[in-house]
Amino acid sequence: MDRYFIVSKVGEGGFGSVYKAMDRQNADRLVAIKEVRLLGLPQQAMIEASDAFEREVAVLSQLDHPNLPRFYEHFQTPTSWYLVMDFIPGETLEEYQSKAPDGRLLLSEVLDIGLQLCPILEYLHAQNPPIIFRDLKPGNIMRTPTGQLDLIDFGIARYFKPGQAKDTVALGSLGYAAPEQYGKAQTTPRADIYSLGAVLHQLLTTRDPSDAPFDFPPLRPKSSHTPNDPGSLTTSIVDVLMDKLETLIASMLTMDVAKRPPDIAYVKQELQIISQLWSDIYRGYWRPQRGMSR
């Protein structure tokens, strides 16, 4: 640890903490150091912490993407394990949403969030074998001061294993995790599609999916939107766009894996169409009622 100067603690979890530090051997480069404390843990907790640490090291050390933290090294002391990676400035998407009026983000912003996350998941799923993140939620998405989104916390990410009936360990965050993550089947990239659907639904409705897992009410009542200038738009056009978004998110959240979108590229394409339509038609002239805003 002499190589690193600890600046501050930036996070804490069940098994340890995350620190912002300077790497003295690399021009005081800012890094994040994830500490897993093993001292005093019960045997089962020690096994879980060790497994999560080893998974994160195995996955991060193989990845190179501008929206993922770069892995530098890992080491251990008699009482703790440490993982050193890029320090990502900013706040989590969960923190960012909590500061919005009524917790509601602009629809254009939610679409941008989805379009930023899709290429990251696409990159993970394109690995050989595919990497399934398995824990996509606002608390694991960092938003930098420039608005860039990065995924953090690969503690339960796993490689897809062809022919395996189900995951070795059932893990995930309640409400965001796909039903197959609860031990009923092996997770595939479509599990991340489900989680992305849960995130988008929460950003659009402010409804926390952990309050009632697998229950996702409609985004808005039918014909609940009225243009500011009735002459500029018709309610039917608004409904067409919102129905398209509703249909996409509902398909992402279906319990049946086979009925979800085939891959994240399809989701990205649909979001691009909706986002472009929104931009081309509305140009800021229309402001929906509570629940959806531009």
Question: What is the predicted role of each segment?
Answer:
Residues 119-131:
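Protein kinase catalytic-loop region centered on the HRD/HxD motif
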Residues 7-14, 18:
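Protein kinase glycine-rich loop
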Residues 167-180:
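Conserved activation segment of eukaryotic-like protein kinases, specifically the C-terminal portion
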Residues 192:
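Conserved catalytic-loop aspartate of Hanks-type protein kinases
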Residues 78-92, 96:
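Conserved short submotifs of the Hanks-type protein kinase catalytic core
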Residues 74:
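Activation-segment/catalytic-loop signature of the eukaryotic protein kinase fold
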Residues 40-62:
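AlphaC helix of the eukaryotic protein kinase fold
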